C-alpha cells in the first residue's frame, strides 16, 4: 500500500465501517476515499451520533441509551413505552434491530441483543411512515430512494436478500 496513489475503500462490516481501516491508512499517510476514521467510528455509535446531530437541528426520534443485564429485562420491559425500536448501541446494517410492539417482543429483542454480546442498546421511539434515503456526496444530494420491504421493516434480511425490498427512485 505504500506505493498506492489512493485506496478506494469498498468495505462492508464492522472492520470496514468502524474506522479501523481508515485509521491505519491515515497513520501511514495513505490517501483514501470516503469518511475519515473519526467520522466512521462515531457513526457506528447510535447514541453518540444522535447527541452530536441534535444541536445541529437534525431531528431524530426520542431515544434512551440503556445498559442492562439479563436480570434487568423484566423491569426494563415494564418501564418502556411501546412500540419501541431496539438497536444494539454499536454496529450497522440493522443487525440486531427489532421493533417491539408487545412486552414479549421487547423481552425477545433485549435477549437477542445480549446473545449478540450487546448489553447496551438504544431504545428509540417507533415512528411509522415511509422509509426514504437520500445520500449526500461532497456538496450535493443524490436522488431520493423509497424503500418498501415485502414484509416487516427494512432489517438486515430485507437489505441483503434479493427481491426482499423494492427501491423506487426518485421517491
Where are these predicted regions, by residue range?
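Phosphate-binding site of ATP-dependent enzymes
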Residues: 101-171
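Conserved N-proximal alpha/beta basic substrate-recognition cap immediately N-terminal to
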Residues: 1-62
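Short connector loops/turns at beta-strand edges and beta->alpha or beta->beta junctions
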Residues: 30, 91, 159-162
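Active-site nucleotide/adenylate-binding loops and adjacent lid/helix of ATP-dependent enzymes
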Residues: 1, 42-130
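Short small-residue beta-strand/loop micro-motif enriched in glycine and branched aliphatics
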Residues: 34-35, 94, 166-169
Amino acid at each position: 500500500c505504500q506505493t498506492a496513489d489512493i485506496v478506494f475503500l469498498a468495505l462492508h462490516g464492522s472492520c470496514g465501517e468502524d474506522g479501523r481501516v481508515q485509521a491505519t491508512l491515515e497513520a501511514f499517510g495513505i490517501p483514501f476515499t470516503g469518511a475519515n476514521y473519526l467520522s466512521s467510528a462515531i457513526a457506528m455509535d447510535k447514541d453518540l451520533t444522535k447527541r452530536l446531530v441534535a444541536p445541529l437541528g437534525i431531528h431524530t426520534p426520542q431515544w434512551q441509551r440503556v445498559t442492562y443485564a439479563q436480570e434487568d429485562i423484566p423491569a426494563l420491559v415494564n418501564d418502556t413505552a411501546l412500540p419501541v425500536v431496539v438497536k444494539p448501541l454499536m454496529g450497522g446494517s440493522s443487525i440486531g434491530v427489532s421493533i417491539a410492539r408487545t412486552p414479549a417482543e421487547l423481552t425477545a429483542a433485549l435477549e437477542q441483543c445480549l446473545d449478540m454480546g450487546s448489553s447496551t442498546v438504544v431504545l428509540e421511539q417507533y415512528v411509522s411512515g415511509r422509509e426514504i434515503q437520500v445520500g449526500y456526496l461532497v456538496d450535493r444530494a443524490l436522488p431520493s430512494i423509497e424503500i418498501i420491504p415485502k414484509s416487516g421493516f427494512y432489517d438486515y434480511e430485507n437489505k441483503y436478500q434479493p427481491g426482499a425490498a423494492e427501491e423506487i427512485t426518485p421517491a
